[in-house]
């Protein structure tokens, strides 16, 4: 407690200090505004001289150090003064005075927003169930964890939602306009549930990985532009594409597209699978089907694969129940480990369906699916069934060690004996195509169908180890020039962008393809293995006259050195393969070693895969799961109008042959070391010669040698090394690819076909 004396003693000092401090502060303010004034400056302050300081009373003189101490603080305060000022209309004083009514209204809108959403959500419910009504995600979601899409809604001051264009187990896809980029996009809205969010995050990671390896976007994978969180939903923004291949089939009344167009789709798909098989990616799509293959433009044949929501990388498989049932591979049905080969099986099923118009294996359940596969391909090999955990779900083992089909419990379904429903007859190889609808058409000769059938049989090999790989599939004669120019869409051997990369250190140095995800997903009510995969039809379909479908991609040069083919897990393959070339030969196609009986001579009448000419009849309407496919009536008046062969321009680059004569080639394998291609020239042949010598087509000699050893790369992948002899390559010109000129393009037979298109804008 202060005494009175102490208080009175302090007062005179306080009275005298106040004016002196204010005086010096004023002087300091003037000094601070002058240039080069600083606490540590060597220059004297002009405001107060030494004589002035000495003339001041003692109490004023002791304030000079205080002056030097305060000056920097004032300078800092001046520097912090704002240079720009806010709009007076937003000032708190204005909001709480003249705009007070507006302020209260805004507070009420924010406060009652949640209550208003709850009220709107429950308006359509029965009044008796009001107590049971629940609100999800503050009224933004429905009871299925899906975002409630409102047309015209604007997100983040950027995306204007136009309409819902797809729905699936993952969530929804909406069409939206991006105000920043000024383009239409497809936004995939993931369900607001942790399991779906986790899987979508894997999808984003895979898509970004593919984007990184494909800056030019030329490998037929959809492009992921960006992703963000909005109201607890992960949203993936994709490029806008056109309708899917199932829509295309539906618009042909399920009669199928031409073999030429099927070839274009097949080559792009094989290129995409080759890209996914690069060691840096090793991605398994796990759900290839017509609904997940979209046209880039309704008047072009360019396609892209979408929906990587079920995808995984090799060695990171987390699901056992994958793939849509019609396209599910035998190893998945049998519960065996799977790899990238399951996508090749799906592709084989898709290509047949695209040409015939109907699924090749349309099982109503897994047992029915396996039985329909066996009808066409026979009983799977014993060495596969012996290792299959679920083999006894479909088959029973006989005392002699062989396997046979189990009898169905209901006894209602009757199947043809194993292997008697021949692919030869399904495709109509010698009867004018499926249902005879392609008889006499250009590009649908017996030779063309034989090549197509052989490629499909290699894709549908029961054994994933010997199932054809994308690298070899792209070299198949189905994609090559024949003596009959009308049988192909290009004048020469077709290659894909993935085949153009040069070999570097035993791997492909690639830019690769991006984007996957599910943009513009299907709206069809197609039967699926998973009932949650049903897609709703969205209204507003419109008809578009498709006159020509051309693929527009890059036209890089083809190098003479092929990349190393990318093997699949467990594949027995040579560690080094030398391709022998001769000036008068044309390389046909490579096959994996130890092909099974499916790949043998098809012209041998004693061979058990010789296809007799039995016609496959359709009895009425065939129920396919949850949908019924329309019956196809073989009317000759409709055959020309249903040709959908979209013309490809320069997209599928081809290597020009130096010789158009009927030629052959051989592929030989050798071990590593200096022995070169002489190592196994005398080994017994593991596959017979395949002869396509019909109707002017070339003869193809396949010579396959077994391999005594295997080098494994990453994740069980065999390591391949390919080299071409330095002699003149018979399938290319000097260093370049002779590109097909526009004048040589065949007339598109798509003119006048009316195609019903999904309401998805084409990019």
Swiss-Prot record:
Residues 159-479 form the Protein kinase domain. It is an enzyme of class 2 (transferase). GO terms for biological process: circadian rhythm; negative regulation of DNA damage response, signal transduction by p53 class mediator; negative regulation of heterochromatin formation; negative regulation of microtubule polymerization; negative regulation of mRNA splicing, via spliceosome; peptidyl-serine phosphorylation; peptidyl-tyrosine phosphorylation; positive regulation of RNA splicing. One of its GO terms (cellular component) is cytoskeleton. ATP binds at residues 165-173, 188, 238-241. The keyword rRNA-binding does not apply. Inhibited by RANBP9. The modification Phosphothreonine is found at residue 402. A motif (Bipartite nuclear localization signal) lies at residues 117-134. InterPro entries: Kinase-like_dom_sf, PKc_DYR1A/1B, Prot_kinase_dom, Protein_kinase_ATP_BS, Ser/Thr_kinase_AS, Ser_Thr_dual-spec_kinase. The active site is at residue 287. Its EC number is 2.7.11.23, 2.7.12.1. Residues 33-61, 115-136, 408-442, 485-540, 596-679 are annotated as: Disordered. Residues 502-525, 654-672 have a biased composition (Low complexity). It is found in: Nucleus speckle. Keywords: ATP-binding, Kinase, Nucleotide-binding, Nucleus, Phosphoprotein, Serine/threonine-protein kinase, Transcription, Transcription regulation, Transferase, Tyrosine-protein kinase. The keyword Cell inner membrane does not apply. The polyhistidine repeats act as targeting signals to nuclear speckles. Interacts with RANBP9. Interacts with RAD54L2/ARIP4. Interacts with WDR68. Interacts with CRY2. Interacts with SIRT1. Dual-specificity kinase which possesses both serine/threonine and tyrosine kinase activities. Plays an important role in double-strand breaks (DSBs) repair following DNA damage. Mechanistically, phosphorylates RNF169 and increases its ability to block accumulation of TP53BP1 at the DSB sites thereby promoting homologous recombination repair (HRR). This is Dual specificity tyrosine-phosphorylation-regulated kinase 1A. The gene is Dyrk1a.
């Amino acid at each position: 407690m202060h005494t009175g004396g102490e208080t009175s003693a302090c007062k005179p000092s306080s009275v005298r200090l106040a004016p002196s401090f204010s005086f010096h502060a004023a002087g300091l303010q003037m000094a601070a505004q002058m240039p080069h004034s600083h606490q540590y400056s060597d220059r004297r302050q002009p405001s107060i001289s030494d004589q002035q300081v000495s003339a001041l009373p003692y109490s004023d003189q002791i304030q000079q150090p205080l002056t030097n101490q305060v000056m920097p603080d004032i300078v800092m305060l001046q520097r912090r003064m704002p240079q720009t000022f806010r709009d007076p209309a937003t000032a708190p004083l204005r909001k709480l005075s003249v705009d007070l009514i507006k302020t209260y209204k805004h507070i009420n809108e924010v406060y009652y927003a949640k209550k208003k959403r709850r009220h709107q959500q429950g308006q359509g419910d029965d009044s008796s169930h009001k107590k049971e009504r629940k609100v999800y995600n503050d009224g933004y979601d429905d009871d299925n964890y899906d975002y409630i899409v409102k047309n015209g809604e604007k997100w983040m001051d950027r995306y204007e939602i136009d309409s819902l264009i797809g729905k699936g187990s993952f969530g929804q896809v909406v069409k939206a306009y991006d105000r920043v980029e000024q383009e239409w996009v497809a936004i995939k809205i993931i369900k607001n549930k942790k399991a779906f969010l986790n899987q979508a995050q894997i999808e984003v990671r895979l898509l970004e990985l593919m984007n990184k390896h494909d800056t030019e976007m030329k490998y037929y994978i959809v492009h992921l532009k960006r992703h963000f969180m909005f109201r607890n939903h992960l949203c993936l923004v994709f490029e806008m594409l056109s309708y899917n291949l199932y829509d295309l089939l539906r618009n042909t009344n399920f009669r199928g597209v031409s073999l030429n167009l099927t070839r274009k789709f097949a080559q792009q798909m094989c290129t995409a699978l080759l890209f996914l098989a690069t060691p840096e990616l090793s991605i398994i799509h796990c759900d290839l089907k017509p609904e997940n293959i979209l046209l880039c433009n309704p008047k072009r044949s360019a396609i892209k694969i979408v929906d990587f929501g079920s995808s995984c990388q090799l060695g990171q498989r987390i699901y056992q129940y994958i793939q849509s049932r019609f396209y599910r591979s035998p190893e998945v049905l049998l519960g065996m480990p799977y790899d990238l080969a399951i996508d090749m099986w799906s592709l084989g099923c898709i290509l047949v369906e695209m040409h015939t118009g109907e699924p090749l294996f349309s099982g109503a359940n897994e047992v029915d699916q396996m039985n329909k596969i066996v009808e066409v391909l026979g009983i799977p090999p014993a060495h596969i069934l012996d290792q299959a955990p679920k083999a006894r779900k479909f088959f029973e083992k006989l005392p002699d060690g062989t396997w046979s089909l189990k009898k169905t419990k209901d006894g209602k379904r009757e199947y043809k004996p194993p292997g008697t429903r021949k692919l030869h007859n399904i495709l109509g190889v010698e009867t004018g195509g499926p249902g005879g609808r392609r008889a006499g058409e250009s590009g649908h000769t017996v030779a063309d169908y034989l090549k197509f059938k052989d490629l499909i049989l290699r894709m549908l090999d029961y054994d994933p180890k010997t199932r054809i790989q994308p690298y070899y599939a792209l070299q198949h004669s189905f994609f090559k020039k024949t003596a009959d120019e009308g049988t192909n869409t290009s004048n020469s051997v077709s290659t894909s962008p993935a085949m153009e990369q040069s070999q570097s250190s035993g791997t492909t140095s690639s830019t690769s393809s991006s984007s996957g995800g599910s943009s513009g997903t299907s709206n069809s009510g197609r039967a699926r293995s998973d009932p949650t995969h049903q897609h709703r039809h969205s209204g507003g379909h419109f008809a578009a006259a498709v006159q020509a479908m051309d693929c527009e991609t890059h036209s890089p040069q083809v190098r003479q050195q092929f990349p190393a083919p990318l093997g699949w897990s467990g594949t027995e393959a040579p560690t080094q393969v030398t391709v022998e070339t001769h000036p008068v030969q044309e390389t046909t196609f490579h096959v994996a070693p130890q092909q099974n009986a499916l790949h043998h001579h098809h012209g041998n009448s004693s061979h058990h895969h010789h296809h007799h000419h039995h016609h496959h009849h359709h009895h009425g309407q065939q129920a396919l799961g949850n949908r019924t496919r329309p019956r196809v009536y073989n009317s000759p008046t409709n055959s020309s109008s249903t040709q959908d062969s979209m013309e490809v321009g320069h997209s599928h680059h081809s290597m020009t042959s130096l010789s158009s004569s009927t030629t052959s080639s051989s592929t030989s394998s050798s071990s590593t070391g200096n022995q070169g291609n002489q190592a196994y020239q005398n080994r017994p042949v593991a596959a017979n010669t395949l002869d396509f010598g019909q109707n002017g087509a070339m003869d193809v000699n396949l010579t396959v040698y077994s391999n005594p050893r295997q080098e494994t790369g990453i994740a069980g992948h065999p390591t391949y090394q390919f080299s071409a002899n330095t002699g003149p390559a018979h399938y290319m010109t000097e260093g370049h690819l002779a590109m097909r000129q526009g004048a040589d393009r065949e007339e598109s037979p798509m003119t006048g076909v009316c195609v019903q298109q999904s309401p998805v804008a084409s990019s």
